[in-house]
Every structure is written in C-alpha cells, then in structure tokens.
A protein has these predicted regions:
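Acidic-enriched and Gly/Ser
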Residues: 1-186
C-alpha cells in the first residue's frame, strides 16, 4: 500500500496529542483542548514512502510534522472528525510540505527549504532582553541551499523578526525557519 505523492505515517508513540507530562512519577494532563495546537503530537513514524520516491527517508524513520496532521476537528454539526490527513486505522497522509525534519536513526536532518535555529541566552547588556538574544541563534540543522551559500551548522546567525516557529526536539527548543529567513552570519 503506497500513495502516489504522500508518505503514510502513524503518530509517534501512537498518540495524536502530546498533552501528558510526567512529574515526580505522576502523569499530569497539560491540556484538554483539542484545538490547542501546542498539545498536538508533532512526531510521526513512516509506515510507507510515496511511489517512486528515491529520497533519503525510509520506512521506520521519524518525521517532525505540522501540528494539523493528527488533530481532531468539529464539523458544522459539532461532531468530532479527523482532519484531511487522516487515512484509516490510525494512519495519516503527510505531503512533502507537511513535514520539516526527519530522523534517519542517527540524526535529525532538515527537509527541503526548512532549517532549524537554536536560540542563544541573552548577552549581557544595558537593554533588558527576555531570556534569549533577540534575532540571533546557532544554526542547528541546515539544508543544502544554506550550505551552497556558505552557511554551516554551528554558525551564529541572525534571522528576520517574527520568523521564529518553536518546536521542542529531543528536549531542546529550536526555531523552524525557511532558508530566506536567515539574514547574516555573525
């Protein structure tokens, strides 16, 4: 069973929502809202690749997906429904523009035009900054386009305002950005 254009995936840990946190051996529900995009599961396991796909992603790899992939919605009559990505038996279609990174069993790799930047702590200054240095970070996961421009993973970079789209990957806060959101190498 393969789709002509989409990956077929299952929710990582078989849960559509990532709204339970363990604290001191006790599970706490952090959100009961199905509309809360921050509580939706962002990780998927690849069940099948698209027909004639020849890229680096294989069955069993993990994908970092858009928050709408696994979400439930209410239809016009208030009935709970799965979103457009739902296929069947807890399987979902993920199109090429619905995932941002993949884990090949060794490391995370940015997909297509996406890159990931790790924010850095605020530098000492007479100007108050909230915890992170504004518009500055370390390129954590680059892409081929950035590499061709000479921007390498580990470079301290500056990025456009309002381009920060936060994800938590392996316990680390990262901003998902597009290649053209990177403004300079510092």
């Amino acid at each position: 069973m393969q789709s002509p254009f989409s990956f077929i995936v299952k929710a990582y840990n078989e849960r559509r929502y990532d709204n339970i946190k363990e604290i001191g051996g006790v599970d706490f529900i952090t959100s009961v809202s199905k509309e809360d995009h921050t509580a939706s599961n962002r990780f998927a396991t690849v069940v099948e690749t698209p027909l004639k796909y020849s890229g680096p992603i294989k069955k069993g790899d993990r994908l970092l997906v858009h928050h709408n992939v696994f979400k439930y919605y209410n239809d016009m009559r208030g009935r709970e429904k799965s979103g457009k990505s739902y296929f069947r038996d807890d399987m979902f279609f993920v199109e090429m523009d619905q995932f941002f990174m993949y884990h090949d069993g060794t490391r995370w790799n940015a997909h297509d035009k996406y890159c990931f930047v790790k924010p850095i702590p605020a530098k000492e200054s007479s100007i108050y900054k909230r915890g992170e240095e504004p518009l500055v970070g370390i390129l954590k996961h680059g892409n081929a386009e950035l590499e061709a421009l000479g921007v390498k993973e580990g470079d301290e970079i500056s990025f456009e305002p309002e381009s920060e789209y936060p994800f938590y990957v392996d316990g680390e806060k990262l901003y998902r950005m597009f290649t053209n959101n990177i403004m300079l190498i510092l």
